[in-house]
């Protein structure tokens, strides 16, 4: 199977690090975006101003799973040059992605208030 690198656009910026990790772990761009858009758990990333999101590798009705897919990204707000409206568009800079064998322990979860603010910025 040949690896096809995703292209950068106004919503997502793919770093070379995440492209290498995607190829190593056999993750597609669509799978990474699905983890970002529908995470089971959100935490603060280990790098400054980052968010880490997780989704089980196989989603079913069980509350236990054998491995997890993690994605770390950073929100980047820049003026939108293409539209004439006044406002800012949020771009997600996808930094890294990895598979975690087993179930990872919960660490610093992001409070619901902050997640609502992030959702308001995105929409």
Locations of the language-model features?
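Ribonuclease/tRNase effector modules and their secretory precursors
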Residues: 1-123
């Amino acid at each position: 199977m040949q690896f096809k690198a995703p292209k950068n656009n106004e919503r997502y910026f793919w770093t070379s690090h995440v492209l290498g990790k995607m190829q190593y772990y056999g993750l597609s761009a669509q799978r990474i975006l699905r983890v970002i858009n529908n995470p089971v758990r959100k935490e603060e990333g280990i790098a400054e101003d980052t968010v880490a999101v997780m989704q089980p590798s196989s989603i079913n009705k069980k509350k236990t799973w054998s491995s997890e897919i993690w994605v770390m990204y950073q929100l980047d707000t820049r003026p939108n040059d293409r539209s004439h409206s006044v406002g800012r568009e949020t771009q997600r800079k996808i930094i890294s992605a990895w598979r975690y064998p087993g179930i990872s322990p919960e660490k610093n979860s992001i409070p619901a208030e902050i997640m609502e603010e992030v959702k308001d910025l995105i929409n």
